[in-house]
Amino acid sequence: MIKQVEKNAKQKMEKVLEATKHDLNTVRTGRARPSLVENIMVDYYGTQTPIQQMAKVVAPEARQLVIEPWDKSVIESIEKAILKSNLGLNPSNDGNVIRINIPQLTEERRKELVKVAHEKAEKGRIAIRNIRREANDELKEMEKNSEISEDNYHRGLDMIQELTDTYIDKIDKMLEDKEQDIMEV
């Protein structure tokens, strides 16, 4: 029974880790990466749709992104969505594709982006801790209902804490890598 609680917690923590990784990938660095804009939502005939589902996004150069929509009529909608995304990007379109030149980041902007990355990582840590709390509550309930012994309860708490520490360390490592990426000139 404890193994099941641990397994459930691990699955949930894995999902949080993936979501945090995805969130951190949306934080801009000095290089052009398709992931920077792929998940920006665009109003596509009344439906919010991510850019990646309506266009091909490539980085032909280190500081340039090219977005080639499959339906040319949405070019202006994509352009507006990018401008509204607060990423500090200035798209330009030639009627067929949207080109985005990624400007060099200033020191001040880098520090702002590091703060944003810290906030996203902290959200991930909080989610991991909430999963730990849920698992601990589940174990406490099992012990209260005499489904597990007190020793097994404490063993379970220790396992969940180890799991929590492992996943928080993974998030910290991702944050550290992202920070280095952002601060790299």
Curated annotation (Swiss-Prot):
This is Ribosome-recycling factor. Gene3D superfamilies: 3.30.1360.40, Ribosome-recycling factor (1.10.132.20). The keyword Transit peptide does not apply. PANTHER family: MITOCHONDRIAL RIBOSOME RECYCLING FACTOR PSEUDO 1, RIBOSOME RECYCLING FACTOR. The keyword Protein biosynthesis applies. Responsible for the release of ribosomes from messenger RNA at the termination of protein biosynthesis. May increase the efficiency of translation by recycling ribosomes from one round of translation to another. Pfam families: RRF (PF01765). NCBIfam families: frr (TIGR00496). GO terms for molecular function: ribosomal large subunit binding. Keywords: Cytoplasm, Protein biosynthesis. Coiled coil: none annotated. Its main location: cytoplasm. One of its GO terms (cellular component) is cytoplasm. Belongs to the RRF family. It is found in: Cytoplasm.
